[in-house]
Amino acid sequence: MNQEIMNLFNPTTPAQVFDQIRISIASPEKILSWSYGEIKKPETINYRTFKPERDGLFCARIFGPIKDYECLCGKYKRMKYKGIICEKCSVEVTLSRVRRERMGHIELAAPVAHIWFLKSLPSRIGLLLDMTLKDLERILYFEYYVVLEPGLTALKDRQLLSEDEYLKAQDEYGQDSFTAMIGAEAIRELLRGLELEKLEQTLRAEMQETDSDIKHKKLAKRLKIVEAFRHSGNKPEWMIMTVVPVIPPDLRPLVPLDGGRFATSDLNDLYRRVINRNNRLKRLMELRAPDIIIRNEKRMLQEAVDALFDNGRRGRVITGANKRPLKSLADMLKGKQGRFRQNLLGKRVDYSGRSVIVVGPELRLHQCGLPKKMALELFKPFIYSRLDAKGLSTTVKQAKKLVEKERPEVWDILDEVIREHPVLLNRAPTLHRLGIQAFEPVLIEGKAIQLHPLVCSAFNADFDGDQMAVHVPLSLEAQLEARVLMMSTNNILHPANGQPIIVPSQDIVLGLYYVSIMREGMPGQGMTFGNMAELEHALHAKAIHLHSKIKYRWEGMNEEGKIAKRWIETTAGRVMLGNLLPKHPRVTFEVINKLMTKREISGVIDQVYRHCGQKETVIFCDRIMALGFYNAFKAGISFGKDDMVVPAGKWKIVDTTRTLAKDFEQQYNDGLITHGEKYNKVVDAWSKASEEIAKEMMKEISVTKKTATGADADINSIYMMSHSGARGSPAQMRQLAGMRGLMAKPSGEIIETPIISNFKEGLSVLEYFNSTHGARKGLADTALKTANSGYLTRRLVDVAQDCIITQDDCGTHLGIKMRAIVDAGTLVASLGSRILGRVPCDDVRDPATNAVLVKAGTLMEESHIDAIQQAGVQEVKIRSALTCELVNGICKMCYGRDLARGTPVNHGEAVGVIAAQSIGEPGTQLTMRTFHIGGAAQLNEQSFVESNFEGKVVIRNKAIARNSEGHLIAMVRNMVVTIVDPDGTERATHRIQYGSRMHVDDGDMIKRGQRIAEWDPYTRPILTEAEGTIGFEDLTEGLSISETLDESTGIAKRVVIDWRGTRGGADLRPAIVIKGKDGKVLKLARGGDARYMLSVDAILSVDIGATVKPGDILARISTESAKTRDITGGLPRVAELFEARKPKDAAIIAEIAGTIRFGRDYKNKRRISIEPVDKTEEAREYLIPKGKHIHLQDGDIVEKGDFIVEGNPAPHDILAIKGIEELAAYLVNEIQEVYRLQGVLINDKHIEVIVRQMLQKIEVTDQGDTDMIAGEQVDKIEFDALNAKAQEEGKKPASGNPVLLGITKASLQTRSFFSAASFQETTRVLTEAAVNGKIDPLEGLKENVIVGRLIPAGTGASMARIREVALKRDKLILDEREKQAAIVPSQPEPQPLALPPAE
């Protein structure tokens, strides 16, 4: 201890070294051991002398001197008296800094409950004592007595008595016959009387006996807290305080303002209240005041202490003089302004500045322009030291003067200092790691920072007044990291998807597009040129045009690396572009011998990077930027009013659509269609019309016109801008020259009347008014979106922050299967794009020859992917973060390629944070609205399956019938069509919908692109399996069925209506039956009668007495009604998936494979059970609300995981029924869907990393012989450790299932309480951690930032690994010594110790 105290005064001593931090409840003895003295008076400082009052809140005797090495009365001054205590004022002569470290205490006259343990839910005191919070408060706030010892009276233990009852009982039983107390003393006695070991045994026994689920949960909660107290060494009575610690005075300062007033920290006010009330209570006790007065004073003391610890948690908030709530100790930690987030996780730093940015087109990619004034200020200390070294100044003062006068030699020295000293530029908001990059500064005049145009997209910067901050890395290590890791030239690829991020945009794209245009009939067409000089000469002489078709002799490089010449047909502009390409055999002229749009340019940069490396790419990018800017300026592209071409056929389309809309209106008025249908149809018609007009306009704009000479005319400027990807989109062009189209209301509904005019024609007043509606919502949305997206990113970072690459290989054989994603016949994501940069679990083989294409454990590069795709491999099983078996972090093999570098991932890479940033950063581009689907949006519903391969058709679970029309119809739900190669390899499998019309049969040969089956996506059929005549049951006109005549077609259709509401209809069970010749209901082959139950809204397709064949449709249920549901899209959907929330109308999923049986209806629910195929399992039963449509019939066979009721599946159900792999596939696909819609590319592995973090907990199903409690959620690591221990001791291990936690919940339940407390719900997290005596092993990033260390990632990880190796080696040596020591006694003479050599 003395050493520590001595270290306090030596500012150079290293900080205490520690590996972990433990938090627990402080006992009164502990608080006293921290304290340097008791505070007895509420006074702070004397207002005349400004000296602290003795024994007050700022007392110098307790907390230390105010001035360094000077006692209060001034008797002892200076260093020589260090450590002496002045006999006059009792102040120790030492540094005033101790006033930040020394604590005091207040001895309370009556015990007080700690509000965190009382009120923070669940109440810890309440759980331990098994009392409700209400009762506890009644005792604590002196309303009721509690019986501690009933003695021989009729009172019960822990019975509550009001004042009157207490007095009555005393009269009745006599004063000493029982003990009852009131207030915190009573609770303290109760807590002290708990025998935890006994209590634990009782609770475990009760849990074994109880059958009620609720009771079991309650007991488990209590048991958990009892165990926590037993194992942590905390005593329950410590939750009641007798001593309050007082924090050091310099952490709650009192600052004199001018005018004799003081500014003070709120804590001083709160402490003052506590001291005042405490002193008053002491005095009242000495005076033997009446009980009621003392009791009131005790209650007030309790309230004062409550307010000090957590103001406003109970009762009303205590406010200061200006009606502002006082900030208590808890508020100091909580929220964005609290200690954690404001000071520990984010700090303001020196050596930084900020200024407006302007474009710097003449900079190189690794440079930024730094204003001289800023540089001078930022590098001041460096300049001083250099001035001193050169002998230009002898003192700092002198150097300061030189710099202030800005002498010429200072500028020379600044140049020297800045050379090769990178600076960091940061643009807020820093949404991903590319928001901070390092550049070499170039000194410039002026006051604005110059930024290279190509890095703008990484910073998301533009030059409309954006500001950026500059930071100077000081130490050599920091400079090294800035240069090697953060230099803009080292960040060419986007960490989210591995695409180049240094991509030209806007003017540069337009210039490059213009250069690469080829036009027919330009001057000099067909001329040939041998080299660049000839070409430039001809261009200057205007003999040829930039766009003329010419022949050119191109010097490329062949595979051997030698120069190879060949003739190519191209244009002069493209040759200029081609000359910038680096020479490489793989990068040919064909790469740029086409029209360069933004996408093409990105592709070229990608190719150059993959083949020629980083340095060449950077040089190439700088060059094409210069070329692009120059040509954009030379081309002089601008646009006028006539460039917006209104298509000729516009009004014709508008008129037809108008008549259509009128027809729909008329049909609605005649009652043929509902309002909803009319709305959908009208909206549909108008959106089709505006699409058509847009097509027409694009056609007219994009066609190249001819001039009088027969040459191609200039391309339309607007089309050039949009087509090149420089600015504007077809949607914007449509509004300029087509028609503006439909507008949305703020609710997201679409207004039926469209805006027919475009901006060129101008809008009418009504149209303008309609359009303001949606536009205003758009702006409001953007503001909300930014906040929501930021919050999502914060939650993601928090859940994944401790996910780091820690080892090379975890050696697992598990993985997840990847296949191409196909939607409605179009390829959404190819297999290659999904497995690039991943590691296969097993050898990837050619399906035709069975040759190994990629060995297991190889990182798949582009070359491997080409081979895999050519061989036509359908599915590859790859290693994934989800299946990685490491305890801490993820291994290199399971992660694969580091997307930002294109190489295998490095040790210590913080992949969790990268994943969080990659998912969160595009969040601002996602939409916020929920789409109301109806009309146009459902036309892309998939309604057929076609084959992507040639081969033979094999049908599993076959059940096909030929219906009356002679078509083949699929009769079961689990039929699978497989396409097989001639040599028997499966190439593709398709699940066929029930009621589909089959185009192929078992054993047919099929061609690529041929349809296998098709179905009507808008209805669900009910098919007959038997041949016979139709009979109706319980189908009574007006009661359970109603007939409507469709006037437009003249056909009557009969619809089943809700029969339950009608009189006498409650017991009806409407159905269609198939009767045989004898008029009896037929029996089906699979068991049961040929009776088909009908649900509400089913439309009948047959009449009584009609004959039907198997496969004929008896009735259909329109899914149209289900389709116009709101689909949550954009950000809310992503958040919903990551939070693992249960969707509103969740699907019901079959938990086992089996046969459907309809049971007896239960109230207003239908009962369905599944008879399992596997007889060892028990049947499952589901209750389904009657309004929901069940598309299954009695006797249908379902597979495990099939939907019984349609809807969005709840992720928890998928995990429970189908397992982790299916869940991962579902989450990845659903999240990717949202991002794909916005055109954002994110690699699957990022989502997998987050999902891994969501699956860290296991729910114990059977505790075995371990200490775990059934139903509790345990960390995977803890679960495995406890099980391993149990197995070692020969006990029965526990079993459990993985649980899926939402990201917020997962963050709050991490192993590190520091990380959780700094995230959300700080008080709750800290309370729980303290009760459990939790230890934070400081493994993640956040915890280490909080305690002020290097993070264990990146360069900080290597230090951690070195330490680990050293510890292992030490352990080996110690073990060896112990072994030797054990052997020694049995031998006669002592042997020298043999030590292994140090590594």
From Swiss-Prot:
The keyword Magnesium applies. Residues 1379-1399 are annotated as: Disordered. Residues 1387-1399 have a biased composition (Pro residues). Zn(2+) 1 binds at C71, C73, C86, C89. It catalyses: RNA(n) + a ribonucleoside 5'-triphosphate = RNA(n+1) + diphosphate. The keyword rRNA-binding does not apply. Keywords: DNA-directed RNA polymerase, Magnesium, Metal-binding, Nucleotidyltransferase, Transcription, Transferase, Zinc. Pfam families: RNA_pol_Rpb1_1, RNA_pol_Rpb1_2, RNA_pol_Rpb1_3, RNA_pol_Rpb1_4, RNA_pol_Rpb1_5. It comes from the Bacteria. Its cofactor is Mg(2+); Zn(2+). Mg(2+) binds at D462, D464, D466. GO terms for molecular function: DNA binding; DNA-directed RNA polymerase activity; magnesium ion binding; zinc ion binding. Zn(2+) 2 binds at C810, C884, C891, C894. Binds 1 Mg(2+) ion per subunit. Binds 2 Zn(2+) ions per subunit. Its EC number is 2.7.7.6. One of its GO terms (cellular component) is DNA-directed RNA polymerase complex. One of its GO terms (biological process) is DNA-templated transcription. Belongs to the RNA polymerase beta' chain family. The RNAP catalytic core consists of 2 alpha, 1 beta, 1 beta' and 1 omega subunit. When a sigma factor is associated with the core the holoenzyme is formed, which can initiate transcription. DNA-dependent RNA polymerase catalyzes the transcription of DNA into RNA using the four ribonucleoside triphosphates as substrates. This is DNA-directed RNA polymerase subunit beta'. It comes from Bradyrhizobium sp. (strain ORS 278).
